[in-house]
Amino acid sequence: MAQVINTNSLSLLTQNNLNKSQSALGTAIERLSSGLRINSAKDDAAGQAIANRFTANIKGLTQASRNANDGISIAQTTEGALNEINNNLQRVRELAVQSANSTNSQSDLDSIQAEITQRLNEIDRVSGQTQFNGVKVLAQDNTLTIQVGANNGETIDIDLKQINSQTLGLDTLNVQKKYDVKSEAVTPSATLSTTALDGAGLKTGTGSTTDTGSIKDGKVYYNSTSKNYYVEVEFTDATDQTNKGGFYKVNVADDGAVTMTAATTKEATTPTGITEVTQVQKPVAAPAAIQAQLTAAHVTGADTAEMVKMSYTDKNGKTIDGGFGVKVGADIYAATKNKDGSFSINTTEYTDKDGNTKTALNQLGGADGKTEVVSIDGKTYNASKAAGHNFKAQPELAEAAAATTENPLAKIDAALAQVDALRSDLGAVQNRFNSAITNLGNTVNNLSSARSRIEDSDYATEVSNMSRAQILQQAGTSVLAQANQVPQNVLSLLR
């Protein structure tokens, strides 16, 4: 080996080995201090990517487990509210059983009905006010989607249903004596026809000398106070017929035909209180007369009172629901069946083809095919004002109305079954969430173990590596000192 002083190969070799052992010592210390085998991608590029995917799954599954617990909480909240609704239904059923006993007086039935109404109101309150984190769980049909996995589409649905007295079919539950309810086909009142009032008809009716007259705009008017019909006649020439232009009373037949009596006298002024009509107007009695009629009727078992369902068709061919009516013998009075068993006189409005708000006429079936109508003028009349007090409490009417065959127990049992079905669904979904939580926990444990084997430090190995590196550092430092002394051997050759 040549003796040189410019390059100390032994020193350079020793320094290189010392740097390697120092790097190994640093890596060992980093892994021991962090507990991780992979502290950056350079430690294990593939292992770092795999471990990072495991971390994403583990964090997602951990949150999914918390989501599932939230799902259990909302299901428990809903089920708790349903339990209270069930308690109220059980009490309603108990009261219904009590009301079925014939020993109860009408006063007893009224008291029982009062508590039933309060219980149903409480069911409505629980339904409308029970909420979880701002979500009203029984106020409407709703599907809640709970994320129970780390990936898209891994969900469990909670189907919530609107539960109140109406959806349970109990909003009209009444254990008092009832009116029979049935459907009746009702014929619409006749449409007015002015075909007969052509030129010749107006010539005869007005007593004019020519037949050049016509009905202005083809309109017929009606005065609800005097019960008279009118048309406005106009003439096209400038002869004496012009003086005959104006309003005339006309006759209206049940079939809607409009005619004029010969030589009818023209109205001195435009009639007041008239409105345009397109159908035959045959109003029934006013509320006061209804009261008198009901009071005087003394309805017997052979002449029972019933509730009837009505509808009619307007001039545009639109079918409009006229609601309920109270039928006493051949007379029918427009009414609405209220939740508490009383009845209220109906009001109905609709918009015609020209966009104008019109008074709706409820078609009420009369005796012997006769068609009667009730004019609805925008006012609502409570049955208590029409008959002195609620129809349901009218002695004659209450005794006359045969108790309905409606079975309140069957309706309540159906409501209980509906509540039980939803409670069963909620119980089942809670069990699903519990199962999902258990599975998520197992998966998180297994994935954590897999990730640990990839990125966690093996302390036995790393301590051994650190000890080896430390020894190499100490030895390398000592050897480097010796290697640095080698060039001094050249001095002996120069002496």
From Swiss-Prot:
UniProt keyword terms in alphabetical order: Bacterial flagellum, Secreted
InterPro entries: Flagellin, Flagellin_C, Flagellin_C_sub2, Flagellin_D3, Flagellin_N, FLIC_barrel
Gene Ontology MF: a single term: structural molecule activity
Predominant place of localization: secreted
Gene Ontology cellular component terms for the protein in this record: bacterial-type flagellum; extracellular region
Pfam family, one: Flagellin_C
Keyword Aminoacyl-tRNA synthetase listed: no
Location(s), subcellular: Secreted; Bacterial flagellum
Keyword Magnesium: no
Misc. remarks from the entry: Individual Salmonella serotypes usually alternate between the production of 2 antigenic forms of flagella, termed phase 1 and phase 2, each specified by separate structural genes.
Family stated for the protein in its record: Belongs to the bacterial flagellin family.
Protein function: Flagellin is the subunit protein which polymerizes to form the filaments of bacterial flagella.
Protein name: Flagellin
Species this protein is from: Salmonella paratyphi A (strain ATCC 9150 / SARB42)
Taxonomy of the source species: Bacteria, Pseudomonadati, Pseudomonadota, Gammaproteobacteria, Enterobacterales
Gene: fliC
